[in-house]
Every structure is written in C-alpha cells, then in structure tokens.
C-alpha cells in the first residue's frame, strides 16, 4: 500500500506537478504469478477508496486490461495490447488514461529499463549536457502542466491533459513493478527522456555550446560529437495504376541500440466530443507513448507516416524554448483530435517546440475510393522547423502513382530555412530533394511495386555493391547498413520495415520486421562485432521474418 503523502525524493517533483490531478490517491495491489512470455494484467479504479488495484489476470470488466507478449528474442518484436474505458463502471477520461499508462508501465517496465540503458550513453555525452537537458525537460514539463491547469475548457489542452495523465500512470506502473521485483525503477527524468528521444535529436544540438557558436553546421560536426546522426528513415505511399490498391510503408534508420521494439495496439474509450479517436496501432518502443518511427494506423481512418529532416541552419535551433510542447506530445494530441489531414496539421502546429523537425504524411483512407478516385485531401504533407509549420494537400502528386519520403524537405520554404540550399552548394546534389540517391531509386523502382511482396522488397532494398545510384555506399539506398561501411562501420542504419495496405488498415493490421536488411546476400547483423555498444536485452543477431501485427482483444 503506497500513499502519495510519503514520496521518495526522486518522486517529489512529479507528485507536486500532478497534485492538481491525483492528490490523495491510494494504490492497492493484488499480485499474482507472472507467466514467462505473455503477461496479462487488469487495472481497477476503486471509486469509494479513490484507489487503483491491479491483478495479473485478463478481466474485460476492469477499467484497463491487456497483455504484453515478449517475443523479442524469437521474432524481434514484443506486442502490447491495452483496452481502457470498456469496463462495467463509468470513469473520467483522466482516470482512464492514468490506468492505461499505469498498465503499460507495469507490463513493460523491464524493457523500459533496458531501452534507457542502451540509449542514454549514446545520446548524453557529458554531465554538462545532461544537466542542461534535465533543466529543459523539467521547465517544459512544469509549463505544460500549468497550461493544462489554466485551460481546462480548451479542447486542445484538455486532450494534452489526457496525455500527461497517461504519462503519470506510466511512471507509477514502472515504480510498482520495480518494488515487486526489488529493482530500481526508472526516474521521472528517465521516463521523460525516453518519450523525448526524437525531440532530443534537435534539443541536444540546440543546447550544445560548441554547436551554438556558429549559424551553420554540417553533418560531420554532429557525428564528431555524437555517435548518431540526425535519425533518418524511408517511407513510401504507392498507388496502383488503376487505383486497385494503395500500399504504405516505413523503414526506420537510427542506432541499432534502439532495436528493442514493441508493436502497440491501444484502444481507449475516451468520452470527449473533441477527441475523434482513442484507438491506434503503431510500431514503438518500451516506455514511449509515440511511435517515433513514425508508423500509425488510427481509429479516425488516418494513416500517419514520418521521416526526419535535418536542420543545418543553427540560428533556427537557437529559437527552441521550454515554453512549448514537444513533438511527441503534439503528435499524440493531433492523433486523438483530428479526423482529416488538414485538422491534424492545424492541431499539430500549435505550441511548436521546434524539436524533432520532420515531414509528416497523413493519408486519409475515408477519401480513397478504390478503382474510382482519390478525393482532394487524401494526402496532406506537414513539415516543421522552429517557429514554423507548413502543410499542404498533395493528393495531386499521389494520383500520379506514389509519394516518397527520404529525409529532405519537400516544402521550398522549409527546405531553404533549414539550410539545405547552402548544404547542397557545399556537399553536392545528392543532398537535394530531386537528386538524392533515394529519390532516384524510388523514382526508378516504385513502378515495380504491384503487390505486398514487392512493396516489402522495395522497403528492404539495399544493393549498394551493384546499384549505380548507391555508388558503393551502403547508406545511399532505401534501407541503410552503416555497419557495412568499410571506412567507419558503426552499428546504425535501417533496422525495421512496416508495410500495409488499405484493407489491412481497416483491420488495424500490418506486417513488421525488426533488424537490418539481409537481402541481396548481405550478412546478418550480429553484436559480436560491436560489443562496445551497449545492447542490453537485445537479440545477439537479427535474421527475423515479417510478423503479422493484429489486435486480438
């Protein structure tokens, strides 16, 4: 039995911040034996006692119930499914979200600790940066909670409150699991760090004194200080010539230390007229509420994909301030509140943090009439830099057959503001939107996509030894293998692919594979060659197949 009145020192800030929500709650626990691979659990809200109770059973009468299937070593993926708000009693949206977050933290706490242990030393290189990041995240968190408290009648901030309630639940679920296991739980900051991984890709350079001295940077400037680049991905939306089908897919690029993967199916019965959906299926990671990749199938009929854009113009990053919402928070809010590409963009642009500056693709399946038409508004493209979000309907481009995305801004204003024009002048046309290697490969090969297998093939494509556009560079292709670079091999590159079509999306279903590509005779990646990089809880080698991801509850 734990009372909020006696927090440990590491818990005090979060409990002060959430006092407007949860002051006086009492947590009660009923603990049962845990199964080895699939762990079921149910959270109950006890209204009379103002307390929560958890049992290691799957009870559909509970306020949040679900399971975690830990198959990472055998298939490359864990699978988490949670339903909340479908029990036999009415509960508030805040309690619903807290219960859902708590259940996720409880079920996945062990892998949350592994994921943090693997990524923190790669992202944070010294105590000065660590303290700057902690200070920024604390100020941002306090500002966010104050805005939620001050704007309870504003639909945007009300939905932001749901996200923060879920975050608080995640923290407490992790704490209680750790107490049961006699383990040290992740701290407040560590959970915030995990959720802000994408935002940190821009926030850390923004806080780094050496990079702030100039107004322009090159990628080697970042690589010299960190062992990761700006985080790249490949995405493709493919329309068959007669509109017979539409395929969509995404392949993530980042450090291989991030390959502790969880595919999540979440279904939250939020009763708010401004919340269009509480349902989403998406690729993700332990402790993260967002996809990060991004690859989402949403209950509103929207599909969301994302690839990262670099910001070479450092003067933009100097505008990053804590009085804003991180990208991961705004994505969650937009995913809940929007029912079209335009409303998603209009929601997402609010309180722009200027961190995790990406291209977002919103595909509205409600506007797709197979073998007939793609209505205006089928595809919206949204791009962000600090202080600016641009968006436009690009359905006319999609009608020509495909939309590719490969880490270079499409919008001319975003492209120029980010410094790509100057970067191309310095480093060549391969960094331009039209002439990048992946632009050429997508342009050449997208016509070969005729079915699901050919869509999988293009998203795993790496023929760097023979493809003239790759020029023998294992990262000048759709699915990078930076570990195969002869000059500077590092355990980073393309480590997954997620693929689906319109009919699968209607069932919240996709195919997903974890691990660097092995097509065209490429060797299976193994950590034995990179043991200096921490890889706690990860498979020793990656030779997995595609897994069908489908909710079952």
Curated annotation (Swiss-Prot):
GO terms for biological process: killing of cells of another organism; phospholipid catabolic process. Keywords: Cytolysis, Glycoprotein, Hemolysis, Hydrolase, Lipid degradation, Lipid metabolism, Secreted, Signal, Toxin. One of its GO terms (cellular component) is extracellular region. It is found in: Secreted. Pfam families: Phospholip_B. It is an enzyme of class 3 (hydrolase). Belongs to the phospholipase B-like family. This is Phospholipase B. It comes from Crotalus adamanteus (Eastern diamondback rattlesnake).
